[in-house]
Amino acid sequence: MRDKIAGALFGMALGDAMGMPAELWGRKRVKAFFGRIEGFLDGPAENDVAFNYKKGQFTDDTGQALVLLDSIASTDYEPDTRDIALRMLAWAEKENAFENNILGPTSKVALANFRDNIQDSRITDKALSNGSAMRIAPIGCLFRPEQKEEIARYVYQVSRATHTSDVTIAGAAMIAEAVSSAMVKDDFDEVMEDVFGIEEIGYGMGCET
């Protein structure tokens, strides 16, 4: 199981780094520009986000996932929203994420509000972005796939600093469930059954959009 957890983390970082040059681009544009991406590449100057990165670098997806892991490890795996937000903000400032257009729209506003001591949950409650889902994969390593209620609840707890809407919690819970299931099951259809089995639970955890 330790090897599978390590594989999930390395796979996340390697896949992120390999996909980095195509950040935010649609399939058609990616195929026209790159043909096929079969190895690590520099972020192209034409990409408004990826131009910040060199080949082999992972993006904010993995960066935030590692911040999240650092936070929960420091609090004995009891999610602390303030600690997560503080660490996310410190990471963002270190990476110049606000200036370099690295943060997504929801995380950017939520973290800026936290920094400026502005209490306003509207941006997180109505979020339609994927900031929680993109960093959530490691959470799936902490649970067995049948623990769907526990997974969804934990996903909400570690996401609420930036995302609290039903659709974002459901999406993130499905990613975490996919990782949890794939670690113990080899059948793709069984994994997908688990993934869709947590969708409504995740929706029920978040604020209605």
Predicted regions and their residues:
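Structured, active/binding-site neighborhoods that engage oxygen-rich ligands
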Residues: 1-209
